[in-house]
Amino acid sequence: MWFFGSKGASGFSSRSTAEEVTHGVDGTGLTAIVTGASSGIGVETARVLSLRGVHVVMAVRNTDSGAKVKEDIVKQVPGAKLDVMELDLSSMQSVRKFASEYKSTGLPLNLLINNAGIMACPFMLSKDNIELQFATNHLGHFLLTKLLLDTMKSTSRESKREGRIVNLSSEAHRFSYPEGVRFDKINDKSSYSSMRAYGQSKLCNVLHANELTKQLKEDGVNITANSLHPGAIMTNLGRYFNPYLAVAVGAVAKYILKSVPQGAATTCYVALNPQVAGVSGEYFQDSNIAKPLPLVKDTELAKKVWDFSTKLTDSQSGESSS
């Protein structure tokens, strides 16, 4: 679909930009957290949300880089409301610190955009001794969402506006390990595959959004949760790629890769476009609903990932699982 740029049911395509899919949308009064907002499509996401009047909190590992991005955005969007806060998703302590500091500001939270990620890195463990891609791409966002969910619920009730949780997944979710999620081998270095581990983390992003949808509906809360594939974009997400592969991809990039404004489009569409009102538990691509791997519709697997993630995050805090 992206290669030909054909429009889907939404009226948008792989060639649509973040500005185009949010044209005419007024986000005044909304507050959003965007993780990984200091690089790649996270920057464009923060910029376009700001352009539409959203107060954006940039959750970034490097606050100096975040401050520079904020400065650049303000130059382009005078009057933009942006804050920079430190967040290292590979560290549960950092996630808890961020959530605590965010709640202490008293800010509402309408939109949570779980954008940050790493891709295809060599085998490494996080500060909590969990395989780094699983820890950063899935577990950090799982914990962040859990800690901020009450704030989102109260914001939705008080503002009478729909809250939206957006998980950036990838088409790589189709290429996880054969067993899908390696619950008993998350830290198995001997059989580690950098790309399959990435796919596993992206599969969990979709399953997380789907289980969230189920729980939010049961609670009767006006909050949606969706996942998406932003498209193939040449950003520093792939900084661990083999250099020869990077050169080969670069040679054909202009024919097959999205620009950053195009890459941020689906995120901004799912976060702001009124067409998505009330839509939850879906997987989007090119600003349209798409079909994910059938495995992600496995509700038992989604619950198992949820329980597994809860156990891992609770074990680092001394809490008991529930």
Swiss-Prot record:
The keyword Membrane applies. It holds the Pfam family adh_short. Residues 298-314 are annotated as: Interaction with calmodulin. It comes from Arabidopsis thaliana (Mouse-ear cress). This is Short-chain dehydrogenase TIC 32, chloroplastic. The active site is at Y192 (proton acceptor). NADP(+) binds at G36, A37, S38, S39, G40, I41, G42, D88, L89, N115, T136. Its EC number is 1.1.1.-. Keywords: Chloroplast, Membrane, Oxidoreductase, Plastid, Plastid inner membrane, Protein transport, Transport. One of its GO terms (molecular function) is oxidoreductase activity. Disruption phenotype: Embryo lethal. Coiled coil: none annotated. Expressed in leaves and roots. Part of the Tic complex. Interacts with TIC110. It is found in: Plastid, Chloroplast inner membrane. Substrate binds at S170. Involved in protein precursor import into chloroplasts. Part of the redox regulon consisting of TIC32, TIC 55 and TIC62. Its main location: plastid. GO terms for biological process: protein transport.
